[in-house]
Amino acid sequence: MRIILQRVNESRVEVAGQIIGRIEKGLNLLVGITPSDTDQEVAWMARKCLELRIFPDQSGKLSQSVQDIEGGLLVISQFTLYGDCRKGRRPSFDKAAPGAMAEQIYEQFVTKLRASGLQVETGQFGAMMNVYIENDGPVTLILEREAESER
């Protein structure tokens, strides 16, 4: 599982010109899924996203999590995070999970985040989306967790 995590002042996602998800201060999560991802990876990634201390306290020190600030999370599925560009001029997406499998794992991830009680908004799985992100910082991190069988 691979996530591009961005600290945002606000973020929204549109499908066919309609806003389907919007948050203010919080995290924008672009989520890539592989066929080997299991419940363990989903739980680890959800916990990591909720608990990472990347928001500043009053002194400016990065000591608060999205839970601490009661921020929102906008979660967007993005299979292109597993694009392999080493050969040729067109990326290969062979390492990305097939659609139905990826959607099931994505929904498990969203469910784990929602269990936190925070506002969790999503894109539309498999749709062409316009994602608007106002970065804060910018603070952008790449989170990766391979299944134990892949380590």
Curated annotation (Swiss-Prot):
InterPro entries, A to Z: Daa-tRNA_deacyls_DTD, DTD-like_sf
Main location: cytoplasm
GO cellular component, one term: cytoplasm
Residue ranges of the motif Gly-cisPro motif, important for rejection of L-amino acids: 137-138
Protein's GO biological process: D-amino acid catabolic process
UniProt keywords, alphabetically: Cytoplasm, Hydrolase, RNA-binding, tRNA-binding
The reaction(s) this protein catalyses: glycyl-tRNA(Ala) + H2O = tRNA(Ala) + glycine + H(+); a D-aminoacyl-tRNA + H2O = a tRNA + a D-alpha-amino acid + H(+)
EC number of the protein: 3.1.1.96
Subcellular location, record wording: Cytoplasm
GO molecular function, one term: tRNA binding
Domain note: A Gly-cisPro motif from one monomer fits into the active site of the other monomer to allow specific chiral rejection of L-amino acids.
Function: An aminoacyl-tRNA editing enzyme that deacylates mischarged D-aminoacyl-tRNAs. Also deacylates mischarged glycyl-tRNA(Ala), protecting cells against glycine mischarging by AlaRS. Acts via tRNA-based rather than protein-based catalysis; rejects L-amino acids rather than detecting D-amino acids in the active site. By recycling D-aminoacyl-tRNA to D-amino acids and free tRNA molecules, this enzyme counteracts the toxicity associated with the formation of D-aminoacyl-tRNA entities in vivo and helps enforce protein L-homochirality.
Protein name (database record): D-aminoacyl-tRNA deacylase
Species for this entry: Acaryochloris marina (strain MBIC 11017)
Gene assigned in the entry: dtd
